[in-house]
């Protein structure tokens, strides 16, 4: 378990350093995950460098690019890439078994429009992604840090909202989802106060799950048990 705190920014909102908003649980790789990393990383893996990516070179084309922070085991990200071959997808995940699982699923699905980082998302966003380059940023089911004294560790804070805004194109969307209602309220408070965004909800709250976000098995089970999931979508307007 690693030390966990929040990111820090200077007065201009530039990322300075981070103490992670996640707990590192590395876990053991299965044979299949290890094989997928070995075989698929040369084509789908992105090695971190503090230089902005040239997306047209990375994907070999000009297309809208979607970036997902913390894709877990990657099943929904692979499904999204398969369902939208006209878009480019980049996933960031710190847990190596998740990276291996994602690459394995992507190879089986035959997707060619997906690239993956095994690195800290804050560093990737600040240094490896050009400003104004993304059509959508996705943050699905981040750690809610339930205890009040841990709320400062939540990734959705004012400074993070500004970092995401800088990376989005005008008209690009920051899409969040959580199964913890209190965290959805926190997200809503942060995002409604964040300059340069417009809530895509007609009533200024949450939105129905959009078709582009697959329903996960965990989520479907939660629905059957009466558990809620809250989606928030904010468009960059300035």
From Swiss-Prot:
Positions annotated to bind substrate: 147, 179, 216-219
Q: Which reaction does it catalyse?
A: guanosine(46) in tRNA + S-adenosyl-L-methionine = N(7)-methylguanosine(46) in tRNA + S-adenosyl-L-homocysteine
Q: Where does S-adenosyl-L-methionine bind?
A: 68, 93, 120, 143
| Signal sequence bounds | none
SUPFAM superfamilies, per the entry: S-adenosyl-L-methionine-dependent methyltransferases
* Transmembrane regions listed in the UniProt entry: none
Q: Which UniProt keywords apply?
A: Methyltransferase, S-adenosyl-L-methionine, Transferase, tRNA processing
Superkingdom in the source lineage? Bacteria
Q: Write out the GO MF terms.
A: tRNA (guanine(46)-N7)-methyltransferase activity
Q: Which residues form the active site?
A: 143
What exactly does this protein do?
Catalyzes the formation of N(7)-methylguanine at position 46 (m7G46) in tRNA.
**Similarity section:** Belongs to the class I-like SAM-binding methyltransferase superfamily. TrmB family.
Q: What is this protein called?
A: tRNA (guanine-N(7)-)-methyltransferase
Per the UniProt record, the lineage of the source organism begins with:
Bacteria, Pseudomonadati, Pseudomonadota, Gammaproteobacteria, Alteromonadales
């Amino acid at each position: 378990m690693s030390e966990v705190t929040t990111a820090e920014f200077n007065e201009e909102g530039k990322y300075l350093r981070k103490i992670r908003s996640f707990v590192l649980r590395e876990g053991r790789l299965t044979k299949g995950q290890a094989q997928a990393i070995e075989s698929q990383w040369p084509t789908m893996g992105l090695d971190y460098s503090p230089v902005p990516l040239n997306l047209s070179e990375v994907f070999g084309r000009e297309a809208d690019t979607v970036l997902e922070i913390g894709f877990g085991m990657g099943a929904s990200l692979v499904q999204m890439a398969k369902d939208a071959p006209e878009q480019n997808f980049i996933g960031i995940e710190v847990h190596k078994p998740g990276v291996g699982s994602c690459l394995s699923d992507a190879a089986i699905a035959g997707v060619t429009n997906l690239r993956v980082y095994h690195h800290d998302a804050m560093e990737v966003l600040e240094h490896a992604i050009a400003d104004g380059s993304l059509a959508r940023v996705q943050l699905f089911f981040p750690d809610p840090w339930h205890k009040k004294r841990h709320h400062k560790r939540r990734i959705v804070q004012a400074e993070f909202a500004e970092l995401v805004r800088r990376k989005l194109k005008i008209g690009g969307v920051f899409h969040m989802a959580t199964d913890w209602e209190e965290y959805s309220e926190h997200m809503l408070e942060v995002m409604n106060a964040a300059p340069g965004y417009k809530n895509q909800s007609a009533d200024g709250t949450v939105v129905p799950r959009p078709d582009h976000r697959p329903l996960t098995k965990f989520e479907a089970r939660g629905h059957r048990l009466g558990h809620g999931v809250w989606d928030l979508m904010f468009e960059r307007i300035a």
